[in-house]
């Protein structure tokens, strides 16, 4: 693992914040938490579901995401991509949907997944938790709506090579049902 992206999560502090026992932070995005890296935010998210989960991941993604899945002691189910959008498709996800518990859907180079709404609906119907990897995409639109507004769970990285650059850091946004 790249040393700069090794997750460092204060689980007790975060759990106290989630349960409302910690300090209150005024966020404009509800249910959002900030971390030292995008990898830390993803690790925290995966750990909410325990270990040994089957995590769907497209083959063209940052190697740090794969490292985090392994750190969480989960199993990776790799999925192919569409070469025009650099992301997986509805048809590919549908083939794997019964063999995954969580789907990490990466949106790369500012291009949202063109099948996003269908994939999200499929995940909801099959009980698969969907989290959007928005580390390379900020305020991309689908049907006139920002991807962030359509997504229930997503994470950012604020490393120097990302759309929102702050040298380091990350953010996780949780859905209401995971937050409460």
Where do the protein language model's features map onto the residues?
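Conserved PLP-binding active-site segment in aminotransferase class I/II-type PLP enzymes
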Residues: 1-51
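Short, well-ordered alpha-helix to beta-strand connector turns
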Residues: 29-30, 52, 73, 100, ...
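Short, acidic/glycine-rich phosphate-metal binding loop used to engage nucleotide
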Residues: 35, 81-84, 160
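PLP-dependent aminotransferase-like
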Residues: 47-125, 129-134, 138
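Short, hinge-like loop/turn segments at secondary-structure boundaries
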Residues: 95-96, 122, 147-150, 172-173
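Conserved active-site segment immediately N-terminal to the catalytic lysine
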Residues: 134-166
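Conserved core segment of the aminotransferase class I/II
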Residues: 163-180
């Amino acid at each position: 693992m790249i040393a700069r992206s090794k997750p460092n999560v204060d689980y007790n502090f975060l759990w106290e914040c989630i349960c409302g026992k910690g300090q209150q932070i005024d966020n404009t995005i509800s249910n959002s938490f900030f971390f030292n890296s995008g990898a830390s935010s993803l690790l925290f998210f995966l750990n909410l579901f325990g270990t040994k989960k089957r995590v769907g991941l497209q083959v063209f993604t940052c190697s740090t995401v794969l490292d985090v899945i392994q750190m969480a002691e989960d199993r990776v189910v790799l999925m192919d991509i569409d070469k025009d959008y650099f992301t997986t498709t509805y048809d590919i996800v549908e083939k794997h949907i019964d063999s995954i518990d969580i789907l990490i859907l990466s949106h790369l180079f500012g291009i949202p997944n063109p099948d996003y709404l269908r994939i999200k609906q499929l995940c909801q119907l099959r009980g698969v938790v969907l989290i959007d990897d928005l580390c390379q995409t900020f305020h991309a639109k689908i049907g006139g709506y920002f991807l962030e507004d359509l997504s229930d769970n997503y994470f950012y990285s604020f490393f120097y090579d990302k759309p929102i650059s702050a040298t380091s850091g990350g953010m996780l946004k949780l859905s209401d049902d995971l937050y409460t």
